[in-house]
Amino acid sequence: MNDYANITQITLLVRRLDIGTKVIRVRQHSQENQLFKYRKDLSYPPKEKVKLARANMDGQPMFYGAVFSNFCINDNPRLTCLLETNKEVLDDTFVGKKDLTYSLWLNKREINLFVIPVFDSYPHPAKDFEWYYELWKELMQDDRINKEQINVLKELSRHFSLTGEKKEEENSYAYTADFTTHLFKTHPEIDGIIYPSVRLKEEGIGAVSYTHLTLP
């Protein structure tokens, strides 16, 4: 078992999404002039098409999306989704066309998302994560988290801050996906995770959930 197993036994900081909270999601088109007419086309991907990603193993569907900041009035979850799913946006050498469909979802019940701590892995995280990090520091100062657990949390934060695209980062997705899987198994009250968007210079807020949301 990985060394992060014991951190799921400590006090978890959670962001709760109230009923009706907006979640933005995007899907890339696989062909020109493609239209999605059904909710299922924009929801969870088919199991057989799911590959290893930041919070899931091969064949393990998860609901990826972006949520609005509680602090920043100019927050744009659509931009977060775009950058998280299309690395070509930041590639000056890319020439071509890509079609996308955005969808707006509302959660049917309260959803509890485990907040990934930022530590020093994120130079400029969204204020939402800075606020939670202050709570993490209180836990550490009160000795409710020991040094070993702190080191594991820092390592977890570091892996979440990587895109997994560079050769030296290729194991990061396996690490974070394994953690997320273990978290859900040991804490059924946790519905997903929330983390800073790396490709938006940590300003966006990404969220992953395995619970069901619905189109408005």
What residue ranges belong to the model's regions?
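ADP-ribosyltransferase catalytic core
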Residues: P61-G164
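Phosphate-interacting basic helix/loop segments used at nucleotide- and nucleic-acid interfaces
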Residues: S172-H182
